[in-house]
Amino acid sequence: MDTVRIAVVGAGVMGLSTAVCIFKLVPGCSITVISDKFTPETTSDVAAGMLIPPVYPDTPIHKQKQWFKDTFDHLFAIANSAEAKDAGVLLVSGWQIFQSAPTEEVPFWADVVLGFRKMTKNELKKFPQHVCGQAFTTLKCEGPTYLPWLEKRVKGSGGLVLTRRVEDLWELHPSFNIVVNCSGLGSKQLVGDMEIFPVRGQVLKVQAPWVKHFIRDGSGLTYIYPGIANVTLGGTRQKGDWNLSPNAEISKQILSRCCALEPSLRGACDIREKVGLRPSRPGVRLEKELLVQGSQRLPVVHNYGHGSGGIAMHWGTALEAARLVSECVQALRTPAPKSKL
């Protein structure tokens, strides 16, 4: 088999980054990214994009740390390059604050971010309702800028992009030899995954250019994340809620919570509401599967279910998915042993 034809289903940060990584790791393949939604209509476009990872209960910590480190290193290199502005990647310093001491004093990612330390008493004076905190510098990756940048890289490597809704992975056979499933919440219908569910997130994008430091409540529910063009204020975590329409009452609550941490936000203007549905499950699904229909076989690599950690973990999981694709390609190119009968 000469050129292996690969379809990547999904064009959020997972689909596009996985396509880029496959081009890097798997020579002699053609890649088509297929999705019914492209930027600016993906969940990744709404994501705050801060590299502060969640913890996945069903995934070993050493694996989560590797995914995060791979992602941090990749984005740090971009932040230190001439591409930073076009890719929407920047370094941001700030504080994660707690109203009671966290169970885990030092998170698993502490030595991946820059300059992680306990907050001083003087720093904590800014947050009288909080008893302790952590100061560090991390990266912010802005979906509406980063996704077109990734898409450009896919096309620049010879990849194709196709707007189409896929109802069944078998539709892609035999046009494609391997399918990579990065369909996020779409996997509920597409592959019958009953473990995946939405966690609704509502945020505000505001103009407040004087806000330079991020502030994140330790619960992860209230946060202020300054970016290139605006400041993201959040948020909500509504399990099982599929509603994509902004709720005015929730917006008022978000603004009130954020102003309690940063009173100067009372002067913020041009407030815009955004809603995204995080594709959540107990652990990321990152594995190979061989679909069989009669004598037909279709190798599939799944890479979805990152919840609130999509951008924080994307490059690490994309690299791992690309390695799995490489194994599938190798299997296709290895002739089956002939029967001696």
Curated annotation (Swiss-Prot):
GO molecular function: D-aspartate oxidase activity; D-glutamate oxidase activity; FAD binding
Tissue and organ distribution: Expressed in epithelial cells of the renal proximal tubules (not detected in the glomeruli or renal distal tubules), liver, right atrium of heart, lung, chief cells of the gastric mucosa, choroid plexus, pia mater, brain stem, midbrain, pons, medulla oblongata, hypothalamus, hippocampus, cerebral cortex, cerebellum, ependyma, olfactory bulb and the pituitary, pineal, thyroid and adrenal glands (at protein level).
Motif (Microbody targeting signal): 339-341
Subunit note: Homotetramer. Interacts with PEX5; the interaction is direct and required for localization of DDO to the peroxisome.
UniProt xrefs under Gene3D superfamilies: D-Amino Acid Oxidase, subunit A, domain 2, NAD(P)-binding Rossmann-like Domain
Protein name from the UniProt record: D-aspartate oxidase
PANTHER family given in the database record: D-AMINO ACID OXIDASE, D-ASPARTATE OXIDASE
Entry keyword Methyltransferase: no
Organism field: Sus scrofa
Annotated keywords: Cytoplasm, FAD, Flavoprotein, Oxidoreductase, Peroxisome
SUPFAM superfamilies for the chain: FAD-linked reductases, C-terminal domain, Nucleotide-binding domain
Cofactors required: FAD
One term under GO cellular component: cytosol
Catalytic activity, EC: 1.4.3.1
pH dependence: Optimum pH is 7.5 to 9.0.
Alphabetical list of Pfam families matching this protein: DAO
Function noted in UniProt: Selectively catalyzes the oxidative deamination of acidic amino acids. Suppresses the level of D-aspartate in the brain, an amino acid that can act as an agonist for glutamate receptors. Protects the organism from the toxicity of D-amino acids. May also function in the intestine.
Domain of life according to the entry: Eukaryota
Sequence positions that bind FAD: D36, K37, T43, S44, M50, G307, I311
